[in-house]
């Protein structure tokens, strides 16, 4: 087999591939063995018709498509290996010559991975992030814990206030007509939570249990149900019950209730401070890593093929579909609820897909430029770390991974980002 690669404009080129006649005849033999099993000919058992008689009756050309299906994938794959190109989309195949006892000649128009011209990626200026934890930060975290431990207690007297939970019946009308999904009974609505459309919750403030009110609102222009978007509506609301938050007292007992590792309120505050410090440090590290990667990607010159963006979009949609399934939803339901469709979803994701592809290509180029390698020991150490994290045997992790090659590539990327961070400077 012989293969020649000719680069055309942009990221497109043509592979010209010639396959020896011997391989062509082998593919025709294999095609005949496959096809003859499906033919009923009087005087012969199924699959036993002689080849010469078959060709005389049906013509050798009747085997060509099956033979091509056999020979093309192998020849194309070998041509890719021989020329060292990296296709990113299915090729456009054009058969120039295919006959029995003759060499096969075909071309494949191929879109390949683009060349990356790296810009500045060493010495990138990154913003220094303050990771100081103040007393106010600790107090706010303590208050949040206190809020989460609060109990809802029925208010026998009084009116709805911000922060209360009102148990209500409601029914919505647009132009005097009730609409689907606009009715609820004994619904617990936290006032000030922003659960309902803007303006709804505020109009319940001041009502007593047993009172009713017509709440006038306008659906937002971007509301997911297109038939309601931007339209004024009236909700008939009845308040059945009002519940107020009763906060627990901040003392040693509270501290022990929320964290079994501490015995006093002071110990809880110290633990909160440590956790906040670790969280801020972790967040700062992530921001720095994201910043250097984004700057290195922005500084590079790349002509990204649309095929790579489409492939990434398909991957992102699959990831999104998996997340939906974990919430008991599927894409069709999501499209109904949001008034969107597959094309609109992809359009929303396209910018992120372009960003992902650009970053991946740039990191790959940096790995090559800096000769970043990963030793087998590093891969094994990472597998052991994963086994400890998931509380699984090392062999089970290896089996789940299948090949360690993908993990090694992930570690190279991590090293490339480490390199960018280590070689950055404070802005």
UniProtKB/Swiss-Prot annotation:
Catalysed reactions, as listed in the record: [protein]-peptidylproline (omega=180) = [protein]-peptidylproline (omega=0)
Keywords: Cell cycle, Cell division, Chaperone, Cytoplasm, Isomerase, Rotamase
GO-annotated cellular components: cytoplasm
GO molecular function, one term: peptidyl-prolyl cis-trans isomerase activity
GO BP field: 'de novo' cotranslational protein folding; cell division; chaperone-mediated protein folding; protein transport; protein unfolding
UniProt-annotated location(s): Cytoplasm
Superkingdom of origin: Bacteria
SUPFAM superfamilies per UniProt: FKBP-like, Triger factor/SurA peptide-binding domain-like, Trigger factor ribosome-binding domain
Residue ranges annotated for the PPIase FKBP-type domain, each copy included: 163-248
EC numbers: 5.2.1.8
Top-level EC class: isomerase
InterPro entries, per database record: PPIase_dom_sf, PPIase_FKBP_dom, Trig_fac, Trigger_fac_C, Trigger_fac_C_sf, Trigger_fac_ribosome-bd_bac, Trigger_fac_ribosome-bd_sf, Trigger_fact/SurA_dom_sf
Function text: Involved in protein export. Acts as a chaperone by maintaining the newly synthesized protein in an open conformation. Functions as a peptidyl-prolyl cis-trans isomerase.
Family: Belongs to the FKBP-type PPIase family. Tig subfamily.
HAMAP family: Trigger_factor_Tig (MF_00303)
Domain remark in the UniProt entry: Consists of 3 domains; the N-terminus binds the ribosome, the middle domain has PPIase activity, while the C-terminus has intrinsic chaperone activity on its own.
Protein name as it appears in the record: Trigger factor
Biological source species: Bacillus cytotoxicus (strain DSM 22905 / CIP 110041 / 391-98 / NVH 391-98)
Lineage: Bacteria, Bacillati, Bacillota, Bacilli, Bacillales
């Amino acid at each position: 087999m012989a293969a020649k690669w000719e680069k055309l404009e942009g990221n497109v080129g043509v592979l010209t591939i010639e396959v020896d006649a011997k391989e062509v005849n082998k593919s025709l033999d294999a095609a005949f063995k496959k096809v003859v099993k499906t033919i009923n000919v009087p005087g012969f058992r199924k699959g036993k018709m002689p080849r010469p008689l078959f060709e005389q009756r049906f013509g050798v050309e009747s085997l060509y498509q099956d033979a091509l299906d056999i020979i093309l994938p192998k020849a194309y794959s070998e041509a890719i290996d021989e020329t060292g190109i990296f296709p990113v989309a299915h090729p456009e195949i054009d058969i120039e010559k295919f006959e029995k006892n003759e060499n096969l000649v075909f071309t494949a128009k191929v879109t390949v991975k683009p060349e990356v011209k790296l810009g500045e990626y060493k010495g990138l200026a990154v913003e220094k992030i303050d990771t100081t934890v103040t007393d106010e930060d600790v107090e706010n975290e303590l208050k949040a814990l206190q809020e989460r431990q609060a109990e809802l207690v029925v208010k026998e007297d009084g009116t709805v206030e911000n922060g209360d939970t009102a148990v209500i019946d409601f029914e919505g009308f647009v132009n005097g007509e009730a609409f689907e999904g606009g009715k609820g009974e004994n619904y617990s609505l936290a006032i000030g939570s922003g659960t309902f459309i803007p303006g709804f919750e505020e109009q319940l403030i001041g009502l007593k249990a047993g009172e009713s009110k017509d709440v006038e609102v306008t659906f937002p222009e971007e509301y997911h149900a297109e038939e309601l978007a931007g339209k004024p509506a009236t909700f008939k609301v009845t308040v059945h019950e009002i519940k107020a938050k009763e906060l627990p007292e901040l003392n040693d007992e509270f501290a022990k209730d929320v964290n079994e590792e501490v015995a006093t309120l002071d110990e809880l505050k110290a633990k909160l401070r440590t956790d906040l410090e670790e969280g801020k440090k972790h967040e700062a590290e992530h921001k720095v890593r994201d910043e250097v990667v984004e700057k290195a990607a922005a500084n590079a010159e790349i002509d990204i093929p649309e095929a790579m963006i489409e492939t990434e979009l398909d991957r992102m949609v699959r990831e999104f579909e998996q997340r939906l399934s974990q919430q008991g939803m599927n894409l069709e339901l999501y499209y109904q609820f949001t008034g969107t469709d597959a094309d609109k979803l992809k359009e929303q994701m396209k910018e992120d897909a372009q960003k992902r592809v650009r970053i991946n290509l740039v990191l790959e180029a940096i790995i090559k430029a800096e000769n970043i390698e990963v030793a087998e020991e590093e891969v094994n150490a990472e597998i052991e770390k994963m086994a400890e994290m998931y509380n699984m045997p090392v062999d089970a992790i290896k089996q789940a991974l299948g090949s360690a090659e993908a993990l090694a590539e992930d570690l190279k990327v991590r090293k490339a980002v480490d390199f960018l961070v280590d070689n950055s400077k404070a802005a």
